[in-house]
Amino acid sequence: MKTTLSIGVLAALCLSACASSGPITAATPGPAASAGSKVLTVFAAASLTGAFGDIGKRFESANPGVKILFNFAGSQALRTQIELGAAADVFAPANTGEVDTLVAGKLVISETARIFLTNQLVVVLPAKNSAELKSLADLSKPRLKIVLAAKEVPVGNYAAQALGKLDASLGAGFKDRVLANVVSYENDVKQVVAKVQLGEADAGIVYTSDAVAAPDLKKIEIPADSNVLARYPLAPLAQSKNPALARSFIAAVLSAEGQAILQRWGFAPIR
């Protein structure tokens, strides 16, 4: 039977963990910090690239001799890699479902997982906006080129949910008309952003954090009642070779400094 993580329990865990204040500090001494075992491998959603990169640099500075190896990709691809035996110490996908699957496979211990941030969606447009898109309703105009993430990717699934919600305000069939304009489905959110930046698409639906990381793009906001709240979980892997170091990195992400970095990159605290 598949074990499903309780959002309420995860939120409570996060609130407790996030209560810690202060900067990113040195890891607690232990086996993981001994010579020859100072490499920490973190598998994280592509949308976390910039923020985790910054947190990682600060963590390495606070812990001389420690090297963090990041693997950023679509959450479902990362989960599959872990299931196939890829070595990882920490997993941070963009939805709870990927962690649920690993809990069921005994690759993550449920009690160690926690939600540590939230994100929402926004429509991004090329800087030139040659299609002259001004509103969400314009996305249903015929012959546009729209790029989305694949439905297996969290942001692709969230985009489909948001488009469905917009049917209520923009008219039945709006979602179908928008999907008729989709010219490609990408493997992660960064690929969606790249195609819009290159002018290969008139619009794409990405996370708010990705729009913050790409200030050259124009954007159209999605109203809160039609948007989707993405909750990101964070967990050490049960087979981690560096469990103490993994816990220390997670503590760094949950620290006041770590949370401030995440918010600078456009993420929001849990709510």
Regions found by a protein language model. Give the residues of each.
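Cys-nucleophile CN-hydrolase/nitrilase-fold catalytic domain and related Cys-dependent amidase chemistry
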Residues: 104-110
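Bacterial N-terminal signal peptides that target proteins for export
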Residues: 1-8
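C-terminal motif of bacterial Sec signal peptides marking the signal peptidase cleavage site
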Residues: 14-17
